[in-house]
Amino acid sequence: MTAPRPMKLTALHHKHLALGAVMVDDSGWQRPERYGSPEEEMRAVQAGVGLCDISPVGKLDLKGKESASLLGRMSSPSTVPRVGQAQWTVLKTTDDVGGVEGLCCRLGSDHLLVMTGLDTVATAEQTVKQHMAVVDGCVHLTNLTSALAAVQLVGPYSRDLLSKLTALDLSPRRFADLTCAQGSVAQVYALVVRADAGSELAYEIYCGREFAEYLWDTLRDAGQEFGAVPFGVVAQRRLRAKA
């Protein structure tokens, strides 16, 4: 008999099961592969708006006066974003042999949040620690992967949906691709990141795990007029691959 192995569940796991999702193991996390046909999910997203549980993405929080210079050391000074901006970057190991891709959000002059892939967060965390060991100054690293839930909105009506629930100015001029801001979403303190998925308009909303179900339900209710549908990892990867 094969011994069971640990499996991580997001705060929205039971919501997915209630919607009839087919679950799949994704780097040790149970995630919805699909709710129905991935092709139908993609069509619905491209015509309206879709919701995807992206809570398992790696989330490394860096705080301290030297956090920006540390990021510059791991990647390059030119890839350190300004406050309120996000930037795709590669975190290089201290020996420059390898690296991990991540999306770095500059939340303050001394505060960064780096998102990584599900399967690379441990490597990214170790890479940060290696650089911290040889850099003078104050930097604090916290792995928030399991502490923060995250929902991705994708589709032409994602801005309309999110605007119903937040006072943040999401206009294209003020909130272009790779912009980030903290504020209230559905009366919950959250981080909003615009990170377009391929050619599709997309936002990522990060909040405390304890508010995940409330946020998911509120987004689905507010999105009914736009035909909002949940979509799984198959559709997510296909959308991301479509440039």
Q: Residue ranges of each PLM-predicted region?
A:
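Basic, glycine/lysine-rich polyanion-binding surfaces/domains
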Residues: M1-A243
